[in-house]
């Protein structure tokens, strides 16, 4: 076993322990000592990998989100048609939230205090942007294939991520009065209605512009 593989295994064990402790005790009540004990490593060893509790939590979060993002891409690539790809995207994320409910609830509670104030957040932001660019390309392809009308792909991708985040947040917060029986299908219907409406209005704007240009040419 190489030194690097030992290092990777130890780091992975620490992150697994951190996820378990944070989920069980919450963020405020978790101490680095608790994680070290759970991972069966010395506190000093843990600090070789992570400099603070905030960095430890965000590293565990980033690890999970990368895993979720990879799973979402795999499922989307297996699907045919934009609607099916959207369904796969949302299903993976909702299932992930269900499996990591206690851990992700910390993210909601601590967003302003840890996510925005640590250098590690730059890696997370970069990952979020990469994911959105991937979805935007999927939407652009659907538009080129004539499956949907012309639409600003980046904004549409952002809307899908917003819907996903809303689904997860309502689940974590337990806001059942704002949920429907099949939230994924409802969310897809809402998004597709908006995309179709935008495509129709865009087509109308294009026709109006063409008429104006033609009229101007006749006058000239």
Regions found by a protein language model. Name each.
Residues 58-64:
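Alpha-helical DNA-contacting segments of helix-turn-helix folds
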Residues 143-189, 198-207, 211-220:
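Hydrophobic/aromatic-rich alpha-helical bundle segments in the mid-to-C-terminal region
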Residues 66-69, 118-145, 154-158, 182:
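Amphipathic alpha-helical packing segments from all-alpha helical-bundle domains
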Residues 1-25, 29-41, 55:
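Basic, helix-initiating cap at the start of DNA-binding domains
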Residues 24-28, 79, 100, 145-146:
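Short coil/turn segments at alpha/beta junctions that flank glycine-rich nucleotide-binding fingerprints
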Residues 39-50:
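Short hydrophobic/aromatic patch on the recognition helix
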Residues 59, 73-102, 157-160, 200, ...:
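Hydrophobic alpha-helical connector segments
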Residues 97-119, 169-170:
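Amphipathic alpha-helical segments used for helix-helix packing
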């Amino acid at each position: 076993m190489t030194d690097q593989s030992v290092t990777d295994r130890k780091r992975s064990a620490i992150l697994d322990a951190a996820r378990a402790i944070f989920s069980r005790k919450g963020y405020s009540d978790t101490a680095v000592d608790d994680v070290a004990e759970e991972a069966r490593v010395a506190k000093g060893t843990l600090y070789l990998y992570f400099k603070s509790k905030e960095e430890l939590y965000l590293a565990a979060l980033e690890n999970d989100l990368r895993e979720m993002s990879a799973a979402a891409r795999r499922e989307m690539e297996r699907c045919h048609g934009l609607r099916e790809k959207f369904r796969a995207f949302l299903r993976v994320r909702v299932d992930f939230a269900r499996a990591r409910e206690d851990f992700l609830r910390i993210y909601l509670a601590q967003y302003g205090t840890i996510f925005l104030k640590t250098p590690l957040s730059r890696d997370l932001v970069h990952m979020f942007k990469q994911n959105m660019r991937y979805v935007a390309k999927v939407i652009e392809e659907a538009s080129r294939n004539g499956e949907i009308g012309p639409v600003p792909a980046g904004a549409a991708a952002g809307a899908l991520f917003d819907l996903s985040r809303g689904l997860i947040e309502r689940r974590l917060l337990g806001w059942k009065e704002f949920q429907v029986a099949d939230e994924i299908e409802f969310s897809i219907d809402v998004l597709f209605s908006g995309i179709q409406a935008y495509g129709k209005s865009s087509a109308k704007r294009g026709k109006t512009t063409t008429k104006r240009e033609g009229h101007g040419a006749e006058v000239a």
